[in-house]
A protein has these predicted regions:
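A charged, aromatic-enriched C-terminal amphipathic alpha-helix characteristic of glycosyltransferases
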Residues: 374-408
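N-terminal subdomain of nucleotide-sugar transferases
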Residues: 1-53, 58-59, 260, 398-401
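Short hydrophobic beta-strand element within catalytic cores of glycosyltransferases
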Residues: 326, 331, 335-338
């Protein structure tokens, strides 16, 4: 099978989308399938682009001076389509176009699939309504959301208009972003989501195409070898790890506020970058928190850090649809801490601590309870270890292949 991935969130980035694409590419290639990846990226030398092409990874035309935060931005979809048609005419003979975002590169992939009559599978990874709300300053959110919505509608039809409501689209900016997400999904032949709760939200707002749940998996070649149950001795330091974006939507600042109220010893290690990185580091230093910010590092280093931790944290609320952080913790047998009840779907029962709400005071109470009952670390760790093989990508990739085969036969 020949499969072409298209994503605006792959090159030059870290996070769940990147991890899932890498894991799936490797697993598919190990089974003999041919996989291309097309992605937006920062400027590169021709020599670097040539080296990437050896692994069938290609950078599409991208803006040289215009970036969205720390994220590269593609050029207009029609420019990318022309580039793809000229430089990769072999795409006409591919079996599936597999789309992993809603930006310019992803739009181009959907449009080309439609032009070439190739089945398209769109993965809806995340809540763009919440991402836009957290990233864009107050006062500009509606303007930016309207502009993105308008730009998107130039290339893909917007047959569904999501109105404001009392559920998830409680302001005009969010309604605009839901309009974008729903119409993007409806242009594909099939939609995948990493979780059932996100599937239900997409259906609620008007996605009419078939939606299947396909959770992300952990790469087999990087799977931790023989981890043992974690233990926290009474009075000893609780080692907490964060390995996701340091950004407003991930709620780093509220978690630092919670740590200020923790009674007991802890060490907080942060791996990853983002819009709140420098602010968080300054705050932790000013408040004399035992927090260490390591920035973006290789996944090998993150794995080693996870292995020496007691507790993994993901404290976003009403934002994450899956949380690759949780899967990476499960593979290593590390208990997890979160605030969003939707995340209970992702990890096994008995392996996590969930805060009663997203408030820093409540989060601190949960952490203080854990420090007062350190024996719970081992109990949760043992649950994680008993389920960890379930998250291997090799256990899940056959499901994806069946999804592809079914859509090809239609």
């Amino acid at each position: 099978m020949k499969i072409a991935f298209f994503s605006d969130c792959y090159l030059d980035l870290t996070g769940g989308i990147v991890s899932s694409i890498n894991a799936q590419k490797t697993a598919l290639e190990n089974l003999g399938h041919e996989v291309y990846i097309f992605s937006t990226g920062f400027p590169r030398k021709k020599e670097t682009l040539a080296k990437m092409s050896v692994n069938n990874i290609y950078q599409v035309p991208s803006c040289k001076l215009f970036f969205r935060g720390l994220t590269p931005v593609s050029r207009r979809p029609k420019i990318i389509e022309k580039w793809l048609s000229k430089n990769h005419p072999e795409l006409k003979d591919f079996d599936v176009f597999y789309i992993h975002y809603e930006g310019g590169c992803s739009i181009a992939g959907l449009r080309l699939a439609n032009k070439y009559k190739i089945p398209s599978v769109q993965v809806m990874h995340g809540r763009e309504d919440m991402g836009e709300t957290h990233i864009i300053p107050f006062g500009f959110r509606t303007i930016v959301a309207a502009a993105l919505n308008w730009f998107h509608s130039w290339y893909l039809p917007h047959k569904v208009k999501v109105p404001r409501d009392d559920y998830l689209a409680d302001n005009l900016a969010k309604a605009k972003m839901w309009t974008l997400m729903v119409n993007h999904a409806n242009f594909a032949d099939l939609v995948l989501t990493p979780s059932e709760h996100f599937r239900q939200k997409l259906i609620h707002y008007g996605v009419k195409k078939p939606i299947k749940v396909f959770p992300n998996g952990y790469p087999d070649d990087q799977f931790p070898e023989n981890p043992t149950p974690k233990e926290l001795e009474p009075g000893k330091e609780l080692r907490i790890i964060w390995h996701s974006r340091v950004s407003a939507e991930k709620r780093m600042m509220p978690f630092l506020h919670a740590l200020e109220k923790v009674r007991g010893k802890f060490r907080f290690d942060v791996y990853g970058g983002g819009g709140d990185h420098f602010r968080a580091r300054r705050y932790a230093k000013h408040r004399h928190l035992n927090a260490h910010f390591h920035g973006n590092v290789s996944f090998d280093k993150i794995q080693k850090a996870i292995a020496t931790s007691h507790l993994d944290v993901l404290v976003s609320y009403n934002f994450d649809t899956f949380g690759m952080t949780l899967i990476e913790a499960e593979a290593a047998g590390i208990p997890v801490f979160f605030c969003d009840p939707d995340m209970e779907e992702i990890v096994p029962k008995g392996s996590f601590i969930i805060s009663a709400n997203e408030n820093p005071i409540t989060m601190a109470e949960s952490l203080n309870y854990l420090l007062a009952h350190p024996e719970n670390i081992r109990k949760m760790s043992e649950v994680m270890l008993s389920h960890r093989d379930e998250v291997r990508i090799s256990r899940r990739i056959e499901t994806l292949i069946k999804i592809f085969n079914d859509i090809i036969k239609k």
